[in-house]
Amino acid sequence: MTHVPRHLVDAFKDQLARLVAIPSVGAEGRGQAETAATVGELLGDLGLDVELHPTAGAPVVFAERRVPGAPTVLFYNHYDVQPADPLELWKSDPFTLTERDGKLYGRGASDDKGQLVSRMIALRWLEERHGRLPFGVVFAVEGEEEIGSPNMTSYVAAQRERLASDVGFWEFGGVDAHDRPTLVCGLKGIASVDLTLRTAAHDLHSAYGPVIQNAAYRMGAAVASLRDEDGRVLIDGFYDRVREATAAEQRYLEAVPPEDDAIKAEAGVERFLAGASGSEFQRRLQLEPTLNVNGVHAGYGGPGMKTVLPASAMAKLDFRLVPDQDPHEIVPLLRAHLQRHGFGDVQAELGEEPEWPARVDPDHPFLRHAAAALEEVYGSPAVIVVSSGGSGPLHPFVETLNVPMAMLGISYPGSRVHSPNEHIRWHDVHRGTYATVRTLERWAGIGVV
């Protein structure tokens, strides 16, 4: 494997340290302006023309360098991060990049500041290898991904001409639990829903249990009516729009090397829902829509005992969706189900702005270039993942811009993304950055192909 040159390794660490030092926590709405300005400065150092585009929330850093008559590659990344809490579990300051044992620790090291710096270093490396590049470059770096990218769909629609590109790189990627390179081709959509219920004017003494409805029981019954023990959603019409897997997608599902035992060990479970295993496990994980209960709250949850009859209850749900499901149809279907099953008193409201599902054809020529580059760099075939179980604003890039986005990068399952002690490994930085370089060289027909 070719390593990133020493001077670019130093540049990677310096640039990442600058970005990690700014606590751009999306949920708290702080640090966005400073981080956007710093990202813009770093992109400007690459010779790109930089603009900070305002949105209803955090600004988008837009940067471009077009080559007349040549194709263009688009990079999507984000500069916001998750909160660092709980701080006491960090072994070093989350906002000071810290190196130990071949790893770089800090909030955003993997998600997503390290990935962004890796792309920038890859472009510098390419120019050192080939001189002026024979393709254009566009960056769109947002500051609200960690809170659901509420403004990205409208931003892409408004800037579609400025963002027009031929191929693209998504903000994340890396290796699986067996250190095999992955190439992810899609993301699920998501609709977050809040359920609320009130059965009395205020909490009561539990002595009223024989005669007054308990909101906790009722909410539990309502939630239990939504899916069966194997995870099958019981809402009428929920699966009507689900797109059947193509022959190619089914082929890639069946080709995924077994990872059942590794995931069971990591999750601490003995059995998957419905006893799924092998390709059926992958089909469910990648291609099935789901209903998940994020949390339920009612009554007293403190120490000791409080004999209370809860008068209200709430539940937070998320629906992970697949093509061609419409996230805006979920709440009407859910309300109809609740009404039909005698839970008309349970209110359902859409939470955060939903995200649509999207997929790229695994056999698209650009993804084939990426797969070939990954096999070359890592020494083993890329694991083609038809769709991640996670979500993100992929839909406007794939559907509005019609850009095939490749998902590869510098992370690994142990990176502690969204958790204390988030980090990346140096050898993943070398491999992931070089994979970006080789993908672009293969696509552009430069260097050894």
Describe the residue ranges of each PLM region.
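Acidic/His- and Gly-rich active-site-bordering loop/insert found
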Residues: 2-109, 126-135, 317
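Short glycine/proline-enriched loop/turn "hinge" motifs that connect secondary-structure elements
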Residues: 8-9, 89, 131-132, 184-190, ...
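Alpha-helical metal-binding/catalytic segments enriched in His/Glu/Asp
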Residues: 75, 98-148, 193-197, 208-229, ...
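Acidic, glycine-rich active-site loops and adjacent beta-strand->loop/helix elements
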Residues: 79-81, 140-149, 171-176, 199-202, ...
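An extended, acidic, His-containing surface patch that forms the Zn2+-binding/catalytic region
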Residues: 82, 177-178, 234-312, 320-333, ...
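A generic structural motif
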Residues: 110, 201-203, 208, 319-327
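Flexible glycine/proline-rich, aromatic-decorated loop/lid segments
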Residues: 182-198, 406-410
